[in-house]
């Protein structure tokens, strides 16, 4: 090697060149290779130590530390003991001497490298590692440095990465736990000393004008006078350096709390100190523009930067954020030892004192203005605390006499409804939802105490209901609600407004469950008020010839109307959301309320359809027209929500006095025909269609087809001259009309169902719907493009409607399915005839196969064996290897979808319990394994694979006797592994395909196929079968272990471990004595002694938890040994 000085200059030059904008990628790769080779040389660390002590180049310093890091984590095993000792002595000295001059990120990296040494050698060879950290903290000049070391040690030693053997990980955690009491005492001392030092100099404040209110609440929340006094002291004025030390100490505590168990080491003194700092977030007087990060390390030990003598308010707020992080780490622990219950109460009491401080009003500040001054991160942390308290600990605290829950709810109410941000408000609503769930579950478990429980909380629930309802109404909250986006969809397909409304209505619904009478009367009163405005609009209509105009023109009137319409739309959604609370056991008790709602909704829907407000000219069309459309759509949707109530109502009055029910249904149906039109906005059209579907499917009144308005809809759909509706509306309407004719009427004897008449009507309906499609009979594939596209459109539209009709009656009785098949039999046969002609048109083929899939799933019996066999044979003949390849390999996904649909049909076929389809099994297996599997086996894309493997699984699962014919009795008397087998070659090929799939990268296929094997084992003892046990099981176990070792499917560690256990449990003795040694013998990259250690550490225990723990230990340690061995220089001797 060259001299150290020359090497340093060369390295600096290379680094400058590497990071220069003009350096090519090829040259960068050359430099990278050169640097890697240098790092692998024996003794390179000495040069790197020289570079660290002499260079001012950040790139050089970072590279030098990375050499040390790589050596310690990967090559330490082969480093001579004397050199290790030199490194252990020299690096801490370097850190101590230069930490004030080094850039902060370099200093942090150096700390990490030293901790890595401790991770390897403490306490045996580096006995003073942790002692040195404690000494650094105790020395004022190095306290920040010691805290960085401590936090790094907690991060790297308590939860180490994969590059340590399991035994060492366990040892490190145990060693650290032994140090926890000392560390916590030390950190408590650091924080207390700084707080006390600066509190002495803090001025005594004048008495607060609201002091008496504060004291009253404190006396309820905190029953310890000294604690009350401590928390009421004014906050200290910290120096900048002291603020940094406190921030680091709190970061250390936060990380420690994330992994140490709750115990007496977390003393009342420490908790009080943390809360002292948490107060600082409440007292902040300036709001940060950027969110605070909890990693303050970067700014702590940077000696190059100068700091003001006193920390600004935002830095004090940061301490409040960090302190709340500590508290939340404690709160998220669900397992609370009995001896820690008192501490938990103390934590809650102290935090609610802070909640009171946040929500108090003074002469100078309203609650909202106080919130706007607080740091956003602090408010988020505080909301997290409240969520954890309610979801995890409320059940522990509620019954404690020292905890005033009602006062807490008062503070939570103020906290919720003064949130400065929408996200903050919605997070608080989630907390209330959790509280309401808690109350509901408590009442269900103690029904005899229902009145007492609700009585205790009734006032709070009433306040909450009123405020939530006000918050969703433009009348009270227009400015904030107008800001919500109602156009852009998020990942859940909701707009901002829809998400806000949904959150709010969920809370309203939960209150309705607890206070049904009050909630309903409050909501219905608000609905009535806005309905009166809407229904009164007919007085403002001005007619001009055939056109009508809404004569509301004054700006203020338009604004008020806009607010009222938006509120009516929201309240209609609320009423629909509450429909579930009027059915079931509550039907009788709440009947009158529900009837009032339904009658009002029917009135509103008919009113909207009659005067066609959605088509009116308005003074502000961009605002009022969407409002009017939405109100009408929501009234239809709200009425649809009551379809289950209507069904129950129908069953109650069907035999006596049905007049009122008939009137409701007839009036509701009268609102639909004007909306079934291409001229009506699609939102309204679809709402009308959905309502008709619900009435036809859920309510099923036997008089529905006799209603003139329903007959109008029937005529509209079957009229060939009428313009076709949009596809979704057309499908929904056809479904509704088909269901009217096919679904049995409730509570009507079979002999009175009028099946003959309904069958005739259904046949006419489908004849009308398939008129154009049936004209294709006998025709060939059109050659002209325009004609071909028109024909394809007819096929796809018709089969789409027919498929939907079939899918919707697939679970119904035999008679409904018989009538359905009779009506579409001609179309089904025509589809099979046309199929070969359109085999190369992927979109048409997919629609045809979807239709046949629906037939197989819903009408298989009605089709009869000859026709189903004809369909299967046609498909098997058409899907040759060439056709499969063409479909799968074509651009886009349409071709793959065709093959997937075909495989889904075969899945239905192989699950058929009878004997009719058994002759097809050899052909299906041949198609799968000889024609399809070779095409997709090596393709990285998961397309088709999932469906193919599901088909293979279903074939094995439902046709096990195709391979194992012996009877159940014979299996019982014979050893299960010795059953005679048939079709062995096909079975082996299928199992090999499953095994091959575990070598592929797709995790979904892996998970699916692993679960299939486990199911076959649990149902058919697959792993115990002689063929599998002797010829396949070792390979499967080996592949699964290799997958774990290579970490290619880490998300499935648990599932893989269980599968390995189930395979090994077939014969544990063979696994331990034969498989494990052979597996380790075949493992590359390990020496003989390491293999022996791995075998010795694998405990021969046969219960699932112990076995899987041994598997994961084996995998972890094997990976670690390989990592070390791969990084050792050639010729290394390991002792």
From Swiss-Prot:
**A molecular function (GO) term:** nuclear export signal receptor activity
Q: What is this protein called?
A: Exportin-6-A
**Primary location recorded for the protein, binned into one broad class:** nucleus
Report the gene name: xpo6-a
Nucleus as UniProt keyword: yes
InterPro entries from the UniProt entry: ARM-like, ARM-type_fold, Exportin-1/Importin-b-like, Importin-beta_N, XPO6
Gene Ontology terms: biological process = protein export from nucleus
The role this protein plays is: Mediates the nuclear export of actin and profilin-actin complexes in somatic cells. Oocyte nuclei lack active actin export.
PANTHER family the UniProt entry points to: EXPORTIN-6 (PTHR21452:SF4)
Any one GO CC term of this protein is: cytoplasm
Q: Where is the Importin N-terminal domain?
A: 31-97
Q: Where along the sequence do coiled-coil regions lie?
A: none
The places in or outside the cell where this protein is found are:
Nucleus; Cytoplasm
Q: Tissue expression, per UniProt?
A: Expressed during meiotic maturation 2 hours after germinal vesicle break down (GVBD) and in unfertilized and fertilized eggs, but not in oocytes (at protein level). Expressed in somatic cells, in oocytes, during meiotic maturation and in unfertilized and fertilized eggs.
User: From which organism does this entry originate?
Assistant: Xenopus laevis
**Keywords carried by this UniProt record:** Cytoplasm, Nucleus, Protein transport, Transport
Q: Which family does it belong to?
A: Belongs to the exportin family.
């Amino acid at each position: 090697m060259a001299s150290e000085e020359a090497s340093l200059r060369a390295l600096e030059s290379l680094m400058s060149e590497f990071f220069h904008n003009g350096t090519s990628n090829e040259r960068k790769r050359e430099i990278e290779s050169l640097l890697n080779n240098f790092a692998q040389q024996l003794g390179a660390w000495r040069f790197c130590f020289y570079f660290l002590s002499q260079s001012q180049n950040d790139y050089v310093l970072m590279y030098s530390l990375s050499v040390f890091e790589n050596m310690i984590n990967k090559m330490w095993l082969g480093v001579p003991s004397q050199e290790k000792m030199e490194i252990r002595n020299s690096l801490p000295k370097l850190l101590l001497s230069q930490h004030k001059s080094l850039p902060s990120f370099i200093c942090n990296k150096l700390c990490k490298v030293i901790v890595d040494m401790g991770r390897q050698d403490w306490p045996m060879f580096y006995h003073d590692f942790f002692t040195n950290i404690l000494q650094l903290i105790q020395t004022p000049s190095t306290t920040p440095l010691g805290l960085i070391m401590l936090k790094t040690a907690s991060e790297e030693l308590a939860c180490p990465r994969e590059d340590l053997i399991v035994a060492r990980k366990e040892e490190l955690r145990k060693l650290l736990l032994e140090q926890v009491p000392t560390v916590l005492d030390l950190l408590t001392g650091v924080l207390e000393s700084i707080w006390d030092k600066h509190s002495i100099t803090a001025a005594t404040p004048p008495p607060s004008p609201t002091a008496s209110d504060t004291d009253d609440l404190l006396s309820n929340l905190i029953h310890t006078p000294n604690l009350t006094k401590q928390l009421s002291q004014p906050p200290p004025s910290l120096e900048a350096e002291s603020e940094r030390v406190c921030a680091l100490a709190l970061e250390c505590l936060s990380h420690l709390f994330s992994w140490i168990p709750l115990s007496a080491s977390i003393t009342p003194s420490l908790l009080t100190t943390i809360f002292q700092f948490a107060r600082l977030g409440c007292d902040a007087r300036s709001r940060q523009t950027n969110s605070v990060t909890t990693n303050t390390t970067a700014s702590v030990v940077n000696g190059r930067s100068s700091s003001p003598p006193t920390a600004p308010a935002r830095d004090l707020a940061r301490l409040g954020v960090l302190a709340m992080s500590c508290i939340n780490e404690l709160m998220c622990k669900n397992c609370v030892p009995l001896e820690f219950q008192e501490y938990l109460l103390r934590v809650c009491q102290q935090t609610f004192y802070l909640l009171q401080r946040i929500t108090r009003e003074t002469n100078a500040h309203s609650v909202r203005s106080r919130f706007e001054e607080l740091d956003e991160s602090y408010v988020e942390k505080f909301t997290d605390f409240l969520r954890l308290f309610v979801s995890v600990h409320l059940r522990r605290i509620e019954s404690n006499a020292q905890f005033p829950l009602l006062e807490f709810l008062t503070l939570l109410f103020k906290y919720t409804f003064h949130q400065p941000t929408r996200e903050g408000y919605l997070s608080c609503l989630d907390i209330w939802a959790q509280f309401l769930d808690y109350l509901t579950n408590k009442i269900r478990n103690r029904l005899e105490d229902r009145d007492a429980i609700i009585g205790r909380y009734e006032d709070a629930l009433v306040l909450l209901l009123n405020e939530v309802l006000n918050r969703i109404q433009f009348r009270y909250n227009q400015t904030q609600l107008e800001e919500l986006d109602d156009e852009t969809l998020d990942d859940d397909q909701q707009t901002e407004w829809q998400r806000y409304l949904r959150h709010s209505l969920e809370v309203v619904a939960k209150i309705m469950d607890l206070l049904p009478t009050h909630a309903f009367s409050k909501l219905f009163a608000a609905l009535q008020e806005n309905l009166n405005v809407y229904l009164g609009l007919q007085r403002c209509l001005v007619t001009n010839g055939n056109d009508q105009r809404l004569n509301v023109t004054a700006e203020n009137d338009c604004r008020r109307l806009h607010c009222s319409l938006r509120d009516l739309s929201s309240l209609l959604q609320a009423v629909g959301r509450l429909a579930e609370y009027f059915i079931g056991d509550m039907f009788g008790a709440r009947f009158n309320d529900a009837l009032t709602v339904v009658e009002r909704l029917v009135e509103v829907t008919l009113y909207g359809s009659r005067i066609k407000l959605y088509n009116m000219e308005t003074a502000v069309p961009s605002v009022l027209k969407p409002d009017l459309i939405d109100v009408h759509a929501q009234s239809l949707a709200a009425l649809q929500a009551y379809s289950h109530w209507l069904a129950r109502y129908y069953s109650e009055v069907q035999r006596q006095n049905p007049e009122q029910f008939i009137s409701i249904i007839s009036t509701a149906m009268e609102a639909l025909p004007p909306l079934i039109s291409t001229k009506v906005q699609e939102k309204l059209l679809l709402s009308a269609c959905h309502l008709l579907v619900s009435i036809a499917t859920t309510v099923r009144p036997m008089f529905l087809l006799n209603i003139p308005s329903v007959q109008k809809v029937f005529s509209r759909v079957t009229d060939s001259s009428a313009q076709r509706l949009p596809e979704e509306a057309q499908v929904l309407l056809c479904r509704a009309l088909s269901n009217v004719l096919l679904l049995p009427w409730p509570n009507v004897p079979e002999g009175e169902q009028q099946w003959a008449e309904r069958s005739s009507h259904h046949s006419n309906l489908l004849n009308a719907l398939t008129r154009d499609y049936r004209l294709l009979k006998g025709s060939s594939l059109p050659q002209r493009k325009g004609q071909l596209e028109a024909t394809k459109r007819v096929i796809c539209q018709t089969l789409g409607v027919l498929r939907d009709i079939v899918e919707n009656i697939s679970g119904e009785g035999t008679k409904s399915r018989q009538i359905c098949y009779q009506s579409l039999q001609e179309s089904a046969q025509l589809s099979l005839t046309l199929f070969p002609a359109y085999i190369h048109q992927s979109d048409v083929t997919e629609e045809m196969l979807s239709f046949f899939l629906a037939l197989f799933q819903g009408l298989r019996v009605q089709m009869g064996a000859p026709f189903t066999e004809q369909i299967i044979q046609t498909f098997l003949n058409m899907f040759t290897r060439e056709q499969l390849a063409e479909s799968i390999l074509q651009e886009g996904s349409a071709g793959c979808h065709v093959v997937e649909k075909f495989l889904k049909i075969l899945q239905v076929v192989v699950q058929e319990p009878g004997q009719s389809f058994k002759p097809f099994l050899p052909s299906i297996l041949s198609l799968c394994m000889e024609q399809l599997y070779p095409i997709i086996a090596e393709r990285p894309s998961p397309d088709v694979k999932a469906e193919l493997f599901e088909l293979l699984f279903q074939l094995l699962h439902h046709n096990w006797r195709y391979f194992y014919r012996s009877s159940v009795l014979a299996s019982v008397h014979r050893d299960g592994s010795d059953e005679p087998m048939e079709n062995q070659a096909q079975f082996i090929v299928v199992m090999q395909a499953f095994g091959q799939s575990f070598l592929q990268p797709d995790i979904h296929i892996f998970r699916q196929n692993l679960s299939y094997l486990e199911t076959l084992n649990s149902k058919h003892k697959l792993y115990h079968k002689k063929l599998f046990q002797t010829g396949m099981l070792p390979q499967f176990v080996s592949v699964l272990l290799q997958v774990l070792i290579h970490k290619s499917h880490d998300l499935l560690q648990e599932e893989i471990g269980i599968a390995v256990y189930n395979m090994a449990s077939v014969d544990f003795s063979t696994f331990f004595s034969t498989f494990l040694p052979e597996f380790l013998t075949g493992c590359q990259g390990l020496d003989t002694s390491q293999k022996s250690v791995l075998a010795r550490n694998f405990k021969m225990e046969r219960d699932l938890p112990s076995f899987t723990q041994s598997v994961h230990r084996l995998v972890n340690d094997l990976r670690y040994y390989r990592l070390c061995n791969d990084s050792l220089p050639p010729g290394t001797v390991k002792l």
